[in-house]
Design a protein with these regions (language model features):
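Glycosyltransferase catalytic domains, chiefly GT-A lineage
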Residues: 1-196
C-alpha cells in the first residue's frame, strides 16, 4: 500500500490496511490517534483451533528455528495501521514471500489456514516490530461465533444488527455456509449505515 500511495504522490502520516470483508462505521473514532506511531493491530479473537493450528503448522514449515507466536499475541491481519517507518518491514515481507512462494504454496493445501496472517505474525515477531494492540472494537471479527449474526432457524435472538452496538469496524469472516453469507451481511450493513 505504501508503494501505491507513493506512486500516486499521496502524502500521509499513517494508513489503515483493512480486509475487503469489513465495513467501517461512519462514526468511528480517529484510531490513528491511538497508535503512538507504532504498528497498530487487533488481537485475533475468533477460532482458536484455526489460530493454534496455523501457528504450529506454519511455524514448523517456515520458521522451525523461531519461537512460536503466542496465541494471545496473535493479531488478525484484517486491520493494520502502518506508517512510513514500516516501509522496510513491508519490503522484507514482500521479499520473504518472493523467496519462499513455492514452499508456501506447497504447504497451503496441507495447512488450510491462509497464507498471510500467520506468516506476517511471525515476521512481525522476528523483526521485533514495535506493535500496539488496539481495542477489539476496531476489528470486531468472527461475528457468527459471538452470536451477532442472526441466522433463521439457528438463532434465538431478534433479527437485527446487534454488532453495531459492539464495535466500530465489522469483519465478516468465518461465517458458516448459509444463505446469509458475507455478501448478504455486508450489503445489509452498508445500507443500514450509509443508506442506498
Amino acid at each position: 500500500v505504501h508503494d501505491i500511495l507513493q506512486h500516486n504522490g499521496i502524502e500521509y502520516d499513517q494508513v489503515l490496511i483493512v480486509d475487503a470483508d469489513t465495513i467501517i462505521h461512519p462514526d468511528t473514532p480517529n484510531f490513528f490517534n491511538e497508535t503512538d506511531g507504532k504498528f497498530g493491530v487487533v488481537r485475533n479473537n475468533g477460532c482458536y483451533e484455526w489460530v493454534t493450528r496455523s501457528i504450529d503448522n506454519w511455524g514448523n514449515a517456515l520458521f522451525p528455528n523461531e519461537s512460536k507466536v503466542k496465541p494471545w499475541k496473535y493479531f488478525n491481519g484484517g486491520f493494520q495501521i502502518t506508517n512510513k517507518s514500516h516501509i522496510p518491514f513491508y519490503k522484507d515481507v514482500q521479499n520473504y514471500y518472493s523467496s519462499n512462494i513455492q514452499t508456501i504454496n506447497q504447504w497451503n493445501d496441507k495447512i488450510k489456514a491462509g497464507t498471510d496472517q500467520t506468516i506476517i505474525n511471525y515476521l512481525t515477531q522476528i523483526h521485533n516490530i514495535d506493535t500496539i494492540y488496539m481495542d477489539e472494537c476496531y476489528n470486531l471479527q468472527d461475528l457468527f461465533r459471538k452470536n451477532l449474526l442472526h441466522i433463521p432457524g439457528h438463532s434465538w435472538f431478534n433479527d437485527e444488527l446487534h454488532f453495531l452496538k459492539a464495535g466500530w469496524i465489522y469483519h465478516f469472516n468465518a461465517i458458516p455456509k448459509n444463505p446469509r453469507d458475507v455478501k448478504y451481511w455486508m450489503e445489509r450493513t452498508y445500507k443500514e449505515l450509509y443508506g442506498n
